[in-house]
C-alpha cells in the first residue's frame, strides 16, 4: 500500500501519484496551482475538496481497472471543486448520497471520461461556472439530474451517455450552453432547458440543443 509519490512535471508544477491505500485529499492538500494528481486503480472512500486553481485529477486505468470513489451510501459528495481551471478524468464514482462532481463558481473546468453510477441527487453539477466542458461521461441511476448545468455560462455538454435517471441533462438559468451529441435514454425526462424563478441569475438564453 503506497501513499503519495512526487515526480517532477515542470518548473512550476508537479505530478502527485496516489495508489490504493493512499488519500486523494492528502494529495490535493499538498498540491500547488498547476499540479497534476494521478490516481491509480483501487477503491477510495472519501470526499475530495479542491479549492485551488489549476488542479487536474486524472485517473489511471490499467487492465480495465479504474480508480473508484465509493461513498458506501454514507458520504454525501465525491468531488467538490471551487477553484478555476479544474479538470477531472477517468474516475468511477458510485454510491454517494448527494453528488458525484459538484462545482461552485469554478471557471474553465473540464469533466471528461468519468463513469458515474448511483450518486444521489446529481451526477455532474457545475453551478455559477464559466467556460466549461462536460464530455464523454456515462451516468446512470441518478435520483434527479445526471448532468445539471445551473446558473452557468459558456458550457459545452457533449457526447455523454445518460440513462435510467430521473432527468438526463438539465440546463437551468444558464446562458451560451451547447448540448450536442449526447445519448439520453430511459430517463423520465431526457434533455430539459428551463428557467426557475427566484434564483440569483434570472435569465436563460442561447442554449443550443442539437444532434442528440
Put a short name on every predicted segment.
Residues 1-6:
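Bacterial N-terminal signal peptides
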Residues 44-50, 66-68, 72-78, 97-103, ...:
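Short glycine/acidic-rich loop motifs that flank beta-strands on beta-rich extracellular proteins
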Amino acid at each position: 500500500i503506497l501513499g503519495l509519490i512526487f515526480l517532477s512535471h515542470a518548473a512550476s508544477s508537479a505530478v502527485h501519484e496516489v495508489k490504493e491505500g493512499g488519500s486523494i485529499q492528502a494529495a490535493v492538500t499538498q498540491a500547488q496551482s498547476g499540479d497534476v494528481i494521478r490516481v491509480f486503480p483501487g477503491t477510495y472512500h472519501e470526499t475530495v475538496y479542491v479549492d485551488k486553481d489549476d488542479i487536474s485529477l486524472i485517473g489511471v486505468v490499467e487492465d480495465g481497472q479504474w480508480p473508484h470513489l465509493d461513498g458506501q451510501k454514507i458520504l454525501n459528495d465525491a468531488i467538490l471543486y471551487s477553484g478555476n481551471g479544474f479538470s477531472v478524468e477517468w474516475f468511477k464514482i458510485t454510491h454517494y448520497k448527494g453528488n458525484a462532481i459538484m462545482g461552485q463558481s469554478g471557471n474553465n473546468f473540464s469533466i471528461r471520461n468519468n463513469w458515474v453510477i448511483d450518486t444521489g441527487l446529481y451526477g455532474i453539477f457545475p453551478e455559477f461556472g464559466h467556460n466549461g466542458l462536460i464530455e464523454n461521461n456515462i451516468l446512470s441511476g441518478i435520483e434527479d439530474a445526471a448532468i445539471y448545468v445551473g446558473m452557468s455560462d459558456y458550457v459545452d455538454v457533449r457526447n455523454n451517455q445518460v440513462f435510467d435517471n430521473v432527468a438526463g441533462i438539465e440546463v437551468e438559468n444558464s446562458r451560451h450552453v451547447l448540448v450536442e451529441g449526447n445519448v439520453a435514454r430511459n430517463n423520465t425526462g431526457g434533455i430539459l432547458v428551463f428557467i426557475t424563478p427566484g434564483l440569483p441569475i434570472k435569465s436563460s438564453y442561447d442554449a443550443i440543443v442539437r444532434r442528440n
